[in-house]
């Protein structure tokens, strides 16, 4: 609670009792108007002028280095661009818990609400011109008139064309800066009533101004460059993104086509519950886009018909919604299509309405001051010459960009004149310097980033694809001005070996002091596995290149040894593994007698290792098949293993382990083992029969995604899968229960599965450590009295009450917080890489099963899989799906430096063998056996050359691992003799 002195000072300053507004700099914070996963948006106003603004409050506690990179991307983009159809960034602030973006306030909501409300948004009313047919429109209860839209279907054609033209202007401007938005959707297209100046300059009267917002996913992407991350909203995603393929700026054109379809029809072109189903529907359409009026015409229905979509808009939508990017309309053709010609400026001709209007409701017009001003402005604009201005791509704000703006040269190519560049909005007068900086030390003054020399630019480690040679953008553009940051002199870490560093927007943190005593496994981490900086020290994705153009720099691009983009989990692998497991399940015969041993160092069958998830009863009618599709990018929801109830339904579907819960949580599954014990919880973690495995029955739709997990994988199994699943299962009994080829296969696959399993367990431990550190950071950074539903703004009273203690411990507490964040990121990095290595072993094993199955089905018609082979396939499928989801979630918490923690696996093997020895001394022989086995599996995984980036293990490491395995094997053999003797005595 605020103390009396603070309360009294606030009352004195405010001038009235119990009246206080939260403030951020020179801005007063008002009511909440929006909320997302990582940010809350509030409406506010300038304290002196009372001009409305929007304040986007982003919680620093939720920001991993990846999310911070997205935020810095948005900040740096908005700071250097100035366009009437792009939401403006006014100012930036930060405190210990939040980063605040003060942005232009758009009072007309967004396009999705506009479509849903048919334009009836309170702030978008207008007064028709004198003598216009719109003056005959009916008014609402408050005497307001809104733009007339059809009662169903899409928007009025004139509004659709105007909105499309405004969106095209924004996209053309972004193209001039080599920017792609990557998340164009109706929710990110904000609306604002046209100002007097905009109406005077020719903006269509009564039609709102459209502004593109939310650049959190935007990135620099030259014309020929390709991206490969999953960003954006599924319903408006291009199919190449849904297929996890590389994509270029043409992905934005698909999104534009989807938005245009929704404006014209009233709904998205494709709808589905998840992106796998969405991709299936897009592929099924085969580029055949059918509009509602065409369906009604073909069916010759006598019911009420839909509003027809103009033919030129239909043609444009079909040209944009092409599945293959090469077949999709290009930017030049899009800008020259002419669909919005005549609808970007006010027409002097009389409007013609296609709707029936009443003639008795013109009263109540012009009641508000704003409406009267609009009428006056319209009358004055009749005799006013519409000014023309050179386009200004960059803000002329001296505080944000001290250098003079350089206008973009006009494009002189044929046909480009159709898309007129709108005049820049008036530059606001800034009376204060920018407040944004992410570093923890307040700088004395802002400094400009100096463009790096060519020699300082990071060199990619891999040669570029010849087919993807970067070309100069055909659109002429000015050199952007330097981005201003308060800590621009700081250096960014490099993820590769050596001491090379990149420029950063943040300052280096002070020396770090651990917040608590005691050894930590991450403190002894070699330098090659640690990011030399806080997660808050991620460099902004936009920097200045040697030629003055905007560039995107990433630690991964300069890495020589990190995992980086070589490991991209793809949906196609998930589909193939699930499909093959389903086929094996369908083609299995009655259970066989399992061979007792394959001569391996391990006695436990691999089938006993079930997924670490609660068992789900197969006969439970309230549970349904849960998709194992990877979670959408930037999702903070971890892959929980929880039962998801549903209504009972028919069919032959069997439940799978759930993947994503209905409730959101920022932490990964609670089923992760909290300790590496092998005693009492062994029975709970390790199943005892194949029946405990979850079997799936829904084969996934096969996509055309390029496989990037461990290189290219054979796709020849697809034909065999389709052929085998189409046959009836014949009643064939195998002559012999022993198949030498299958026995060799299972021996090899089991060894791979064991390696995958132990790496998965170790990854779970690291992910658990990450969540515990996250909880520690959340607890330590939440001040008393500021929890619960308190808005995330700095409260003067609480700050005054705690000022003394803060001044004494601010340095140590900040260092502790940064230390926790670094350890949290390091744990997530380890988890991601270990999950990926585990997935690599699983995929390798499944490929062997796939090749074996194809050979058998090609030679023997109606070949029946053994129960053992089916059991192995189900285990691999279940483990792949669980590992896949956890890797996707851990990736959102990880940083840029992703190196294989071989030292961690080695230390884990040694510790586990020690624990096993202690258990043996205490007489717990079963637990000791499991510990020795696990230790050997870990060392065998280290001896597998496939886990290393260069494909070979260092000789000295191989010798060390072999030397360590000898005594463990000796102990295991002796222990098994004891177990055999004890079992023999028990039998007697």
Swiss-Prot record:
- Segments for region (Disordered): 1-21, 394-561
Q: Which GO terms describe its molecular function?
A: ATP binding; protein serine kinase activity; protein serine/threonine kinase activity
Q: Residue ranges under compositional bias (Polar residues)?
A: 468-478
Please cite one Gene Ontology biological process associated with this protein: reticulophagy
Q: Report residues binding ATP.
A: 33-41, 56
Instruction: List the catalytic activities from the record.
Output: L-seryl-[protein] + ATP = O-phospho-L-seryl-[protein] + ADP + H(+); L-threonyl-[protein] + ATP = O-phospho-L-threonyl-[protein] + ADP + H(+)
UniProt-annotated catalytic positions:
183
Q: Where do Pro residues bias regions lie?
A: 449-463
Say yes or no: keyword Transferase present: yes
What cellular-component terms does GO give this entry? autophagosome; cytoplasm; cytosol; phagophore assembly site; phagophore assembly site membrane
Write down the top EC class of this protein. transferase
Q: How does it assemble?
A: Homodimer. Forms a ternary complex with ATG13 and ATG17.
Q: Which family does it belong to?
A: Belongs to the protein kinase superfamily. Ser/Thr protein kinase family. APG1/unc-51/ULK1 subfamily.
Protein name per Swiss-Prot or TrEMBL: Serine/threonine-protein kinase ATG1
């Amino acid at each position: 609670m605020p103390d009396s002195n603070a309360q009294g000072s606030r009352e004195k300053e405010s001038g009235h009792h119990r009246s206080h507004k939260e403030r951020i700099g020179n801005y007063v914070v008002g009511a909440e108007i929006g909320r997302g996963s990582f940010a809350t948006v509030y409406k506010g106003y300038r304290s002196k002028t009372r001009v409305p603004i929007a304040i986007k409050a982003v919680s620093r506690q939720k920001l991993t280095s990846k999310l911070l990179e997205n935020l810095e991307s948005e900040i740096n983009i908005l700071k250097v661009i100035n366009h009437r159809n792009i939401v403006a960034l006014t100012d930036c602030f930060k405190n210990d818990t939040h980063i605040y973006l003060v942005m232009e306030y758009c009072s007309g909501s967004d396009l999705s609400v506009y479509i849903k409300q048919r334009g009836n948004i309170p702030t978008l009313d207008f007064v028709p011109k004198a003598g216009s047919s719109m003056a005959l429109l009916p008014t609402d209860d408050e005497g307001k008139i809104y733009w007339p839209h059809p009662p169903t279907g899409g928007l009025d054609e004139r509004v659709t064309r105007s909105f499309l033209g405004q969106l095209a202007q924004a996209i053309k401007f972004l193209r001039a800066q080599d920017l792609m938005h990557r998340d164009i959707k109706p929710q990110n297209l904000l609306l604002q009533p046209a100002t007097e100046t905009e109406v005077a300059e020719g903006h269509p009267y009564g039609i709102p101004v459209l502004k593109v917002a939310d650049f959190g996913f935007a990135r620099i992407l030259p014309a020929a460059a390709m991206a490969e991350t999953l960003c954006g909203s599924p319903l408006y995603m291009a199919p190449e993104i849904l297929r996890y393929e590389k994509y270029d700026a043409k992905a934005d054109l698909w999104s534009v086509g989807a938005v245009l379809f929704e404006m014209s029809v009233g709904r998205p072109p494709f709808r589905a519950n998840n992106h796998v189903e969405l991709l299936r529907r897009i592929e099924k359409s085969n580029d055949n886009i059918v509009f509602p009026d065409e369906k009604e015409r073909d069916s010759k229905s006598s019911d009420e018909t839909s509003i027809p979509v103009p033919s030129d808009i239909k043609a444009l939508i079909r040209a944009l919604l092409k599945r293959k990017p090469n077949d999709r309309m290009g930017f030049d053709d899009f800008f020259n299509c002419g669909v919005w010609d005549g609808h970007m400026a006010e027409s002097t001709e009389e409007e013609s309405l296609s709707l029936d209007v009443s003639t008795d409701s013109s009263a109540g017009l012009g009641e508000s001051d704003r409406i009267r001003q609009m009428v006056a402005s319209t009358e004055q604009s009749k005799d006013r010459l519409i000014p023309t201005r050179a386009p200004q791509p960059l803000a002329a704000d001296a505080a944000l960009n001290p250098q003079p703006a350089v206008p973009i040269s006009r494009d002189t190519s044929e046909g480009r004149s159709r898309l007129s560049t709108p005049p820049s909005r008036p530059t606001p007068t800034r009376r204060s310097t920018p407040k944004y900086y992410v570093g923890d030390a307040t700088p004395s003054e802002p400094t400009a980033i100096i463009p790096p020399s060519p020699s300082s630019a990071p060199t990619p480690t891999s040669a570029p694809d010849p087919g993807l040679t970067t070309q100069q953008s055909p659109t002429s553009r000015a050199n952007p001005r330097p981005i201003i940051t308060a800590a621009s002199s700081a250096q960014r870490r490099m993820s590769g070996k050596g001491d090379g560093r990149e420029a950063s927007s943040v300052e280096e943190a002070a020396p770090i002091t651990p917040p608590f005593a005691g050894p930590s496994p991450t403190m002894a981490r070699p330098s090659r596995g640690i990011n030399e900086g806080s997660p808050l020290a991620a460099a902004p994705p936009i920097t200045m290149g040697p030629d003055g153009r905007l560039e995107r720099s990433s630690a991964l691009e300069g890495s020589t040894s990190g995992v980086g983009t070589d490991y991209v989990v793809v949906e196609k692998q998930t589909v193939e593994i699930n499909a093959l497991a389903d086929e094996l399940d369908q083609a299995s015969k009655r259970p066989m007698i399992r061979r007792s041993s394959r001569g391996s160092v391990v006695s436990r069958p691999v089938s006993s290792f079930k997924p670490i998830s609660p068992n789900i009863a197969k006969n439970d009618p309230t549970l349904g098949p849960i998709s194992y599709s990877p979670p959408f990018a930037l999702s903070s929801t971890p892959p929980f293993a929880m039962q998801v109830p549903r209504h009972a339904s028919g069919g032959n579907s069997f439940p799978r382990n759930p993947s994503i819960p209905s409730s959101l949580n920022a932490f990964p599954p609670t089923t992760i083992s909290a300790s590496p014990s092998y005693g009492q919880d062994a029975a709970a973690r390790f199943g005892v029969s194949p029946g405990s495995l979850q079997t799936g029955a829904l084969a996934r739709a096969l996509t055309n995604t390029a496989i990037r997990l461990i290189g290219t994988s054979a796709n020849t199994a697809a034909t065999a899968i389709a052929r085998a699943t189409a046959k009836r299962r014949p009643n064939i009994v195998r002559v012999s229960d022993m198949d030498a080829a299958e026995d060799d296969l299972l021996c090899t696959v089991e060894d791979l599965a064991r390696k995958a399993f132990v790496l998965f367990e170790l990854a779970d431990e690291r992910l658990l450590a990450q969540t515990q550190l996250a909880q520690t950071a959340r607890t330590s950074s939440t001040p008393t009295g500021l929890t619960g539903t308190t808005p995330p703004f700095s409260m003067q009273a609480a700050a005054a009450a705690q000022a003394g203690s803060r001044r004494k411990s601010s340095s140590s507490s900040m260092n502790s917080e940064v230390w926790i964040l670094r350890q949290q990121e390091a744990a997530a990095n380890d988890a991601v890489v270990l999950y990926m290595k585990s997935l690599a072993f699983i995929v390798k094993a499944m490929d062997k099963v796939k090749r074996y199955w194809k050979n058998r089905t090609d030679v023997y018609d109606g070949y029946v899989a053994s129960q053992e082979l089916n059991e192995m396939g189900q285990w691999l499928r279940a483990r792949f799906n669980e590992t896949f989801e956890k890797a996707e979630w851990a990736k959102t918490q990880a940083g840029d430096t992703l190196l294989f923690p071989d030292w961690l696996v080695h230390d884990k093997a040694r510790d586990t063998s020690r624990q096993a020895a202690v258990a043996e001394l205490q007489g717990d022989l079963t637990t000791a056996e499991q510990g020795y086995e696990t230790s050997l599996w870990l060392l065998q995984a280290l001896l597998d050359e496939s886990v290393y980036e260069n494909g070979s293990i260092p000789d000295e490491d191989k010798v060390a691992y072999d030397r360590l395995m000898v005594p463990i094997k000796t102990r295991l053999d002796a222990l098994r003799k004891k177990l055999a003797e004890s079992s023999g005595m028990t039998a007697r």
